[in-house]
Amino acid sequence: MTAPGRAHSPSGDEDAPGRVVVFAPAPLLTITIEAGRFGGEVHVHAGGQGVWQARMVAALGAPVTICATFGGETGRVAKALLLDEGFDVVAIDRADHAAAYVHDRRDGERSPVVETDDPPLSRHELDELYAATLREAMGAAVVLLSGPAGDEVLPADTYRRLAADLGAFDCLVMVDLAGERLDHALQGGVDIVKVSHEELLDDGRLGVDAGHADAGRADESAIVEAMHRLRSEGAGAVIVSRESEGVLALIDGTVVRATAPDMEVVDTKGAGDSLTAAIAATLAREGVDLRRAVAVGAAAGALNVTRHGLGTGDEGAILALAEHVVVTDREG
């Protein structure tokens, strides 16, 4: 195992103002087969929640650093692909292979062919990743804590410790987590929590069992109550994505709705990550109020569903669409 180091720093972005640091514990190697000539097209990328978020942050022009672990053949390929995209990567070597998936989209639907598990990080690997993240966060405008695909990659309490330690350095901490990981992050205290309506439902935070016939129709008031509870548990602000029903945000005690124009759907996967990343990038770059950032995030999420690439987007299109996002206070 080598000491943690910056694998790539093409333009000195680690010292740039408005930088976003993404904690991405275990990126994936993703292989997607699309329809095309000669039997189809094969697309190979680095992926995973943190990578998709970093990709959108970069698309919106904010400097971004990815803190992550890489191991085995799949990890080496994933890291090389990130470097090829020009990312600033703080890489920790790990003994085990990185997880990977192969998805077939030739019929228009995303069908899993192979999905491998992600082994747990060793104590030493996690310690190195943790220290590297704290170091990089010192000069960052926003620190975004993402989760790995595998449940066993790292202890959920890592998020409590990270949130608390980052808060002690006055870092603006945003998390896009659910379940036990979110519970622990809240204990550490975070500035912004982003969660989906489905995750609130699965976590039992809406007062409706996820298997109940009415589970998909939890009313808005139940979501708002859950948002206030999240705030009481340690969140400064709470943002909830609701697929086609727009975004709800609890900001300074006021609930607002952000509604983007309806778009034709190509692939819904990654829309929530684009929302999260666009909010982080806007706060880092512009230092504006959270309402404006939520409008940009809603636009990024809406445009994401029109594209095949996860976490991809056009800055001009996103900012233009943001002007058409309606943000209003919710009464009651």
Regions found by a protein language model. Name each.
Residues 1-67, 76-80, 332:
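Glycine-rich phosphate/adenosyl-contacting loop at the front of the ribokinase-like
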Residues 4, 8, 210-332:
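Conserved phosphate-binding/catalytic region of the ribokinase-like
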Residues 19-21, 111, 141-142, 237:
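Structural motif
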Residues 55, 100-104, 246-250:
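Short beta-strand scaffold segments in enzyme catalytic cores
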Residues 59-142, 320-332:
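Conserved N-terminal subdomain of the carbohydrate kinase-like
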Residues 119-122, 149-153, 181-184, 201-202, ...:
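Short, small-residue-enriched loops and turns at beta-alpha junctions
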Residues 137-153:
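Short acidic, glycine-rich surface-loop motifs adjacent to enzyme active sites
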Residues 157-253:
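Conserved phosphate/ATP/ADP-binding segment of small-molecule kinases
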